Amino acid sequence: MYAVFQSGGKQHRVSEGQIVRLEKLEAATGDVVEFDQVLMVSDGNDVNIGAPFVSGGKVKAEVIDHGRGDKIKIVKFRRRKHSRRQQGHRQWFTEVKITGINS
């Protein structure tokens, strides 16, 4: 059984027991969070597609960890002008473990 849900402006395809990295959520480590913006649920034979969301569909997950991703570098370079601008960014994320899918 798997589901597609929306969180942080992104869509994620998950199944039970899977660990997923999402955009940062305001929840403490160990908390249980519910996602109700479920776009699709499938159990092998039946496929339930929402318009836009599946009614009664929920994905439950447990917050495992918060952290920051790898650093990316942003460089703006102007040729022949002796001008260069460099900036770095590390995005916050929340790691969750999917504990249940309801359709």
Swiss-Prot record:
**Does this entry carry the keyword Ribonucleoprotein?**
yes
Q: Name one GO biological process term.
A: translation
Q: What Gene Ontology molecular function terms does this protein carry?
A: rRNA binding; structural constituent of ribosome
Key words of the record: Ribonucleoprotein, Ribosomal protein, RNA-binding, rRNA-binding
Concerning Pfam families, the annotation shows: Ribosomal_L21p
Concerning InterPro entries, the annotation shows: bL21-like, bL21-like_sf, Ribosomal_bL21, Ribosomal_bL21_CS
Where does the chain cross the membrane? none
- Work out whether the entry's keyword set contains Kinase: no
Annotated Gene Ontology cellular component terms: cytoplasm; ribonucleoprotein complex; ribosome
**The family this protein is said to belong to:** Belongs to the bacterial ribosomal protein bL21 family.
Q: How does it assemble?
A: Part of the 50S ribosomal subunit. Contacts protein L20.
The UniProt function text for this chain reads: This protein binds to 23S rRNA in the presence of protein L20.
What is this protein's record name? Answer: Large ribosomal subunit protein bL21
